[in-house]
């Protein structure tokens, strides 16, 4: 028979926290996250919770982490690949100075427009340049132009996991030396350590190998320093050093 601790662990892949205890995660949210969550972010989080694909959103604790991180590095020029309804985008916009900019790319404008009224009401829409469509062609054009090399303070990637390595090959040229790239979902619901016969959802099993490949590549990349954190579904921060 399982102990109380075992009963409290997340049994179903898809939970946004990697903590072993639901109660402990709820404690963090209720003690440190929700009481300090800006009203606009709370509103967008509650709107997104009604979306059938709400698990795609950035968790509230990760949003808080990103917001503080951006302030600590004094970010001004940023990029986000994978927007969904815009919760992490809103966290970023709130952290940037009034003349800060975010190039935001997603293949689905409809989801972005769910959160856009909240962003507009918060007076932050002027910071966002939203582009609908695949990000790779945009990145290739930016690299070809030449003027964008080393121009970004921070880049956040929360998109198609099978293209993470393709993004990295390009983003390393676009982020400045000393700047950060954040890759989301790098622990992928904990599946990175799941045994081969573990009962995983089809999409989790499919993308797991891409996440494993990314993690291995980042750890071996001499151009960056890395820090992998168990926040949300796992986020790996890469600081460009050369």
UniProtKB/Swiss-Prot annotation:
Catalyses: (E)-caffeoyl-CoA + S-adenosyl-L-methionine = (E)-feruloyl-CoA + S-adenosyl-L-homocysteine + H(+)
Q: Does the keyword Protease apply?
A: no
Residues reported in the UniProt entry to bind a divalent metal cation: 158, 184-185
Metal-binding in keyword set: yes
Q: Where does substrate bind?
A: 16, 158, 189
The source's superkingdom equals Eukaryota
Q: What does this protein do?
A: Methylates caffeoyl-CoA to feruloyl-CoA and 5-hydroxyferuloyl-CoA to sinapoyl-CoA. Plays a role in the synthesis of feruloylated polysaccharides. Involved in the reinforcement of the plant cell wall. Also involved in the responding to wounding or pathogen challenge by the increased formation of cell wall-bound ferulic acid polymers.
Give the coiled coil ranges: none
State what protein this is by name: Caffeoyl-CoA O-methyltransferase
- Please name the pathway: Aromatic compound metabolism; phenylpropanoid biosynthesis
Q: Which UniProt keywords apply?
A: Lignin biosynthesis, Metal-binding, Methyltransferase, S-adenosyl-L-methionine, Transferase
Q: How is the cofactor bound?
A: Binds 1 divalent metal cation per subunit.
So where does S-adenosyl-L-methionine get bound? Answer: 58, 80, 82-83, 88, 106, 135, 160
Instruction: Point out the signal peptide segment.
Output: none
- Top-level EC class, please? transferase
* CDD domains in the cross-refs: AdoMet_MTases (cd02440)
For biological process, the GO terms are:
lignin biosynthetic process; methylation
What cofactor does this chain's UniProt record say it requires?
Answer: a divalent metal cation
Native species of this protein? Solanum tuberosum (Potato)
Instruction: Name the Gene Ontology molecular function terms of this record.
Output: caffeoyl-CoA O-methyltransferase activity; metal ion binding; S-adenosylmethionine-dependent methyltransferase activity
Concerning its family, UniProt says: Belongs to the class I-like SAM-binding methyltransferase superfamily. Cation-dependent O-methyltransferase family. CCoAMT subfamily.
* Entry's EC annotation: 2.1.1.104
